[in-house]
Regions:
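Positively charged n-region of N-terminal signal peptides that target proteins for export
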Residues: 1-4
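Bacterial N-terminal signal peptides
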Residues: 6-14
Length: 124
């Protein structure tokens, strides 16, 4: 009982440490959106119309994660996610299938960088 009270009293201090999300934020939803976008980016490059649709879907998922990460106090992670969302959104304006392939690879790399940042530094 006493140990539980001590942990409860220290929880706000522990959550304030760098690398941890703020309490009561939906960090898991942001992580899941990032994973979903990574799965889409890892698929083989589609044709032009399918590529535009995939870019829109990736961008939508990534943009949904940005306010979650900001609300959790993860500004750097939100920034990396925003860059990935911008690259995915570029796919919607592609004029050739070859552009889709290149743009998807750029978005995939940026998503991978965001995930790597999250794995190495947590919520920052």
């Amino acid at each position: 009982m006493r140990r539980g009270l001590i942990l409860l009293a220290l929880a706000p201090l522990l959550m304030g440490q760098g690398g941890l999300p703020r309490p009561r934020c939906d960090f898991g939803a942001g992580v899941e959106a990032l994973r979903d976008a990574a799965r889409l980016a890892a698929l083989p490059p589609p044709g032009l119309l399918e590529g535009r649709a995939r870019g829109e879907e990736m961008s939508t998922r990534l943009r949904a994660a940005i306010p979650v990460f900001i609300g959790c106090g993860c500004a750097t992670l939100a920034g990396h996610t925003a860059e990935a969302a911008g690259l995915a959104a570029n796919m919607t304006g592609a004029t050739a299938a070859a552009q889709i392939s290149s743009m998807q690879e750029q978005a995939r790399m940026r998503i991978s960088m965001a995930q790597g940042h999250m794995d190495r530094q947590g919520c920052r």
